[in-house]
């Protein structure tokens, strides 16, 4: 089965072709980072308009790269949520229109299920069951995964997602959008130990997260340094390092706790923050101690992309899942509502 995948949940327009027998044939991506940088964050209306502008050219590019034509495509998978409603509607409308014109099925895919399954596109994919850490700008969740659609939420953030905390902390210190990569880059020049921030909710049982207090601690420290006349680039780097260390250690502690609670030895990390090198090193070290394994997607598939949507959609389409041509998207969509295969 050859599936065309469309991703438009936020500020990346992603298109890919995935074949159930030959694997990923082609993928293309346009990032709107430069468009939104001047505003310090994603502007939903601008995001939607740019998706409209980019979608069809990217589809043509992907078909050409895979040496395919429209009649080769068996189905279309598109992101139906969660995400920005206007952006989601662009992808959904395009998918349903093409499906109607080509007389093929179209299926809405859960954005975070796409992220969760993205490591399965790699040469050494994880095997069920496993624990997944979904960590991005909008989500921080620990999920037990027994199969596609068989998800048990173990814990999630009570306030800010980890990626959101990275972005907001960077913005508070005058760094460019997106803040996550800027924090990581600055942390490389930081002096260890100059600042120490709390590891939120690690001193109590459970698998819930909270990053709003950590973000506030970083802000207060930066403002105190500014008041003392020390707002140098080195101070910014030192705070970035301390902040990143706190987030990474918090995530690692919770992942270790989830693995022990479930008795599993395999961990998948997915979502934009999974590209963070410090997080990968920390989790690999922890899994080494437990004699387990950690899996993640290649860096370009950690952020939003069409490949993960094409793959996730293909699994559900092959299992016989169908939907009509109505256009429906969801800004919020708990993964527990998904049906198992």
UniProtKB/Swiss-Prot annotation:
Q: Which GO terms describe its cellular component?
A: cytoplasm
Broad class of where this protein is predominantly found: cytoplasm
Please state the Enzyme Commission number of this protein.
2.3.1.234
Q: What class of enzyme is it?
A: transferase
Q: Where does Fe cation bind?
A: 111, 115, 304
Please verify whether the record's keywords include Iron: yes
Compartments, as annotated in UniProt: Cytoplasm
What is the cofactor note? Binds 1 Fe(2+) ion per subunit.
User: Is the keyword Acyltransferase in the record?
Assistant: yes
Transmembrane stretches, start-end = none
Where substrate binds, per the record, is at: 134-138, 167, 180, 276
Entries under InterPro entries matching the protein: ATPase_NBD (IPR043129), Gcp-like_dom (IPR000905), KAE1/TsaD (IPR017861), TsaD (IPR022450)
| Protein purpose | Required for the formation of a threonylcarbamoyl group on adenosine at position 37 (t(6)A37) in tRNAs that read codons beginning with adenine. Is involved in the transfer of the threonylcarbamoyl moiety of threonylcarbamoyl-AMP (TC-AMP) to the N6 group of A37, together with TsaE and TsaB. TsaD likely plays a direct catalytic role in this reaction.
What protein name does the entry list? tRNA N6-adenosine threonylcarbamoyltransferase
Keywords for this protein: Acyltransferase, Cytoplasm, Iron, Metal-binding, Transferase, tRNA processing
Top-level taxon in the UniProt lineage? Bacteria
Q: What organism is recorded for this protein? A: Pseudomonas syringae pv. tomato (strain ATCC BAA-871 / DC3000)
Which family does the UniProt entry place this protein in? Belongs to the KAE1 / TsaD family.
